[in-house]
């Protein structure tokens, strides 16, 4: 994984921490040397290992983790359900949802306007909503940094 992709993945995952994003963790255990794989909720353990390559073994000190990776389960924007679209439509009028973006109109004074600028608080609301619903808005699935959760029962 390139440093650029590693930083992109880490920034994306840190924004998702409050929402309990699950993913596939693969690593070689430092004590036994055996490979381990499983589905985990991303947490501070993963941040530590992704950034330093080590984890705390308590009385044994820090141990190096080899071959570590974490791939979150995310949904492509195109997999948004009708219920999710209705929830999003309360704040924005969704014109189209594409594999790499959402085209929206902004609601103002009783009508939908494509020319109005979306204010900062609304963008924050949208990003938090996308994180809460585990949507891939960074293109991580396409880059092989995340697993497409469509059709999987992981949440």
What residues fall within each predicted segment?
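Structural boundary micro-motifs
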Residues: 1-155
């Amino acid at each position: 994984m390139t440093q650029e992709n590693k930083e992109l993945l880490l920034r994306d995952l840190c924004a998702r921490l409050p929402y309990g994003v699950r993913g596939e963790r693969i690593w070689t255990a430092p004590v036994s040397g055996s490979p381990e794989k499983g589905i985990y909720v991303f947490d501070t353990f993963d941040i530590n290992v992704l950034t330093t390559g080590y984890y705390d073994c308590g009385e044994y000190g820090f141990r190096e983790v080899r071959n570590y990776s974490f791939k979150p389960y995310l949904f492509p924007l195109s997999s948004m359900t009708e219920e999710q679209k209705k929830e999003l439509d309360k704040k924005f009028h969704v014109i189209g949802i594409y594999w790499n973006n959402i085209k929206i109109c902004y609601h103002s004074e009783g009508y939908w306007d494509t020319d109005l600028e979306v204010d900062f608080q609304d963008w924050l609301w949208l990003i938090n909503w996308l994180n809460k619903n585990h949507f891939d808005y960074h293109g991580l699935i396409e880059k092989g940094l995340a697993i497409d959760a469509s059709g999987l029962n992981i949440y």
